[in-house]
Regions:
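N-terminal low-complexity, Pro/Thr-rich disordered segments
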Residues: 10-11, 21-64, 90-93, 100, ...
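Sec/Tat-exported extracytoplasmic proteins
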Residues: 63-76, 174-181, 261-265
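Extracytoplasmic/secreted envelope proteins and their assembly/folding machinery
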Residues: 60-66, 164-171, 255-258, 262
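A short, solvent-exposed beta-edge/loop patch
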Residues: 193-258
Length: 266
């Protein structure tokens, strides 16, 4: 891959990520021994009695913090990362819950929300730096420098059955919109061409997808995970720039991040 192509691919991939997150580009085990199959398939396991929502303070305590996920940098999302719910538009109304999840917007009914950015730390193995890639030292430099995954986590609490209802709404939207839709975030349109369900377990319910978007003939894969535990729902949007650039990079679900959040909600 020529240097100019590498740079162009990096810019295009960055733009695709920013369109989905506006400005926030950034398999856990079942500890209680519950039915993994049900969780993996997103089956409903709504509480028999109304659940009490975590307060804003309790939610902050349950949110991820530096040191919770090995080899990552965890920070609290700032004002520049926020996307207002009314700033997300879709061409198919049924797909709005998915567009919200991809943008870090809480699902309907949330009483409190906090957000985190979890970014892989560069490996100290002598790989190429971002500076090398910018200078155009070839495809290997691009792959080494950008083979880092960023995950945006939105953790929300709900009263009563609103948590299970929000999870169910997202599950239905993902099924209804598997064939694609167009989302416009902060005025920037993004064409989602497919949503493919992946296997994941955790919490009371968990679902995951590979979401593929398209721009100027180039496709960009991202990962989306939803986890519900009690009255809390977390969504995870993960993006790997090298994978988006078409490099031969294995881009997995952010299972370590999901597992860490699941544990903190115990």
């Amino acid at each position: 891959m020529r240097a100019t192509v590498v740079r162009r691919t990096a810019l295009a991939a960055s733009a695709a990520a920013l369109a989905l997150l506006a400005t926030a580009c950034s398999g856990s085990s079942d500890a209680d021994g519950k039915d993994d199959k049900g969780a993996a398939n997103g089956s409903s396991s709504a509480p028999k009695t109304p659940a009490k929502a975590l307060t804003a303070a309790e939610l902050e305590k349950a949110a991820l913090a530096q040191g919770d996920v090995k080899d990552t940098k965890i920070t609290k999302a700032g004002p520049a990362d926020e996307v207002p719910a009314d700033g997300v538009k879709v061409d198919k109304e049924a797909c709005l819950p998915v567009a919200h999840a991809l943008s870090g917007v809480a699902q309907e009914g949330a009483v409190a929300t906090t957000k985190r950015k979890v970014i892989d730390e560069p490996k100290a193995d002598g790989g190429k730096s971002l500076e090398d890639a910018a200078k155009g030292e070839g495809a290997d430099a691009f792959k080494d420098a950008f083979n880092l995954t960023s995950t945006f986590v939105a953790l929300s609490s709900y009263e009563g059955t609103a948590g299970p209802d929000a999870f169910a709404a997202l599950k239905k939207a993902a099924a209804d919109c598997a064939g694609g839709f167009t989302a416009t975030v902060a005025g920037t349109p993004t064409k989602v061409v497919s949503m493919t369900e992946e296997k994941i377990t955790g919490g009371d319910e968990a679902l995951a997808w590979t979401v593929t978007s398209e721009s100027d003939g180039a496709t960009t894969p991202v990962k989306l995970v939803a986890l519900r535990k009690g009255s809390s729902v977390a969504t995870f949007f993960a993006f790997n720039l090298a994978a988006a650039g078409g490099e031969n990079v294995t881009f997995e679900l952010p299972t370590a991040v999901v597992a860490a959040q699941d544990e903190k909600l115990a």
